[in-house]
Design a protein with these regions (language model features):
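Asp-based, Mg2+/Mn2+-dependent phosphohydrolase catalytic module
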Residues: 3, 7-8, 16-17, 21-128
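Conserved phosphate-coupling serine/threonine residues in phosphotransfer and NTP-handling enzymes
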Residues: 13
């Protein structure tokens, strides 16, 4: 499913960049990721604005044209606070635990989330 989307995915981690790259490689996900960002680059932990804005600034895109997918509600809230669109994978926390932000998209797992994103975007394309 991920290769069908032909999405240019990036990761943004509170963890060590090297550890994240190894984790992606060990799970054969590195082929879908074009760049990995770490909070080490901005010396500020998510959900503060700096890590999210580092990514949008790097690619010179507006936050509202960027989609952050996460399984932690606090991460989605940080992304929403800087204007990013958000997608929530519910299977990790089981639901939005303490977030005041409602995600733009959600799914029980990554495949369901991707299907929901594609379905909504198809509806928007047809409606315009």
């Amino acid at each position: 499913m991920l290769n069908i989307l032909d999405a240019k995915m990036k990761t943004l981690t509170n963890g060590n960049k090297h550890t994240t790259l190894k984790l992606l490689s060990n799970n054969n996900l590195n082929r879908f990721i074009v760049k990995t960002f770490s909070i080490d680059d901005v010396k500020s932990w998510k959900p503060s604005p700096d890590p999210y804005l580092m990514v949008t600034n790097h690619y010179k895109v507006k936050p509202e044209n960027t989609l952050m997918i996460a399984c932690h509600s606090w991460d989605l809230e940080g992304a929403k606070n800087v204007g990013l669109q958000t997608g929530y994978i519910k299977s990790y926390e089981g639901g939005l635990s303490h977030s005041r932000s409602i995600p733009d998209y959600e799914g029980d797992n990554i495949l369901e989330l991707a299907e929901n994103i594609l379905s909504i975007q198809e509806d928007q394309i047809i409606a315009t």
